[in-house]
Amino acid sequence: MKTQLIILLFSLTLNQQNSILIDFGKEKKGRYWNVVNDGVMGGLSKGGKKITKNSLLFMGEVSLDNNGGFSSLRKSFSEVDISNFSDVEIRYRSSGISFAFSLAVSRRWYVPNYKISLESTSSEWKTTIFKLTDLRKHYIGKALNDRLKKETLKDIIRIGFITDQKKYGEFEFELDYIKFK
């Protein structure tokens, strides 16, 4: 019996190290996420979130007025070491404007972050998997040539999503889960 317990505990530890799951349905992780719109710089875009039975729904409207043009959904700041992982899997659906998955290494808005675009799904659920090293460095919305380096994955302090085009329009973006593996 003691041996079985040790094996069970060891396998649970291995599973925890093999992936990190952010579940917006069953575990309701959406309460730790916040909406940030371009109002922080004078824009007039609107965005909101709603925790549903099985997901986190992010919806709103991007406005280009007053030099605006984005709405974002971001996890609260917290250190996340994802250096043991090479891939991220996201189950989502969207309509309207396209989105990007983003990782930040600084609290300062002017320090570059890393993004990768997500395909629009026409409101159909989609599961997408990509390499973390495929994320590209961006500086205030402009893509740079650098890709995310493996050693930078230990320095992540924020995970998020942002409208990926400076384009007017309504949007819905619904998340089931994010899994680092």
Spans of features found by a protein language model:
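Beta-rich carbohydrate-recognition modules and glycan-binding surfaces
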Residues: 16-181
